[in-house]
């Protein structure tokens, strides 16, 4: 008797990075172990990877999500990776002020740009 066993299909998630407040990048992966001219599109179901929820700066795992096999000729080995959210650049620019010698100092003010996700200057700046 000849027994044909399943081949091991390796799926490795690509590491991803985004800046706080930006949209998630596409979660992609690499495939190895295909046999006999098979393609990833023919043996995988086309499902998407998912990631651990969260939008603050930090590291979030990339999971297998809905990605799976449609071919009975393979066993799937999935290796996750991480989505890293980095800090956004916040610009604070002091407004130009003038005063006449001897007068009281004017109120010092500034402009802020680069706020994201509905953040306000009062919520992210102190002092």
Regions found by a protein language model. Give the residues of each.
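Short loop/turn motifs that initiate or flank beta-strands
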Residues: 1-127
């Amino acid at each position: 008797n000849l027994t044909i066993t399943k081949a091991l299909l390796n799926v490795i998630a690509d590491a991803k990075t985004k800046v706080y407040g930006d949209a998630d990048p596409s979660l992609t992966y690499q495939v190895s172990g295909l046999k006999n001219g098979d393609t990833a599109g023919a043996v995988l179901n086309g499902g998407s990877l998912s990631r651990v929820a969260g939008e603050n700066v930090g590291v979030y795992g990339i999971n297998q999500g809905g990605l799976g096999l449609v071919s009975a000729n393979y066993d799937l080995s999935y290796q996750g990776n991480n989505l890293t959210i980095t800090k956004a650049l916040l610009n604070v620019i002091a407004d130009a002020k003038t005063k006449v010698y001897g007068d009281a100092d004017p109120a010092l003010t500034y402009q802020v740009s680069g706020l994201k996700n509905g953040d306000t200057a009062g919520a992210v700046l102190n002092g």
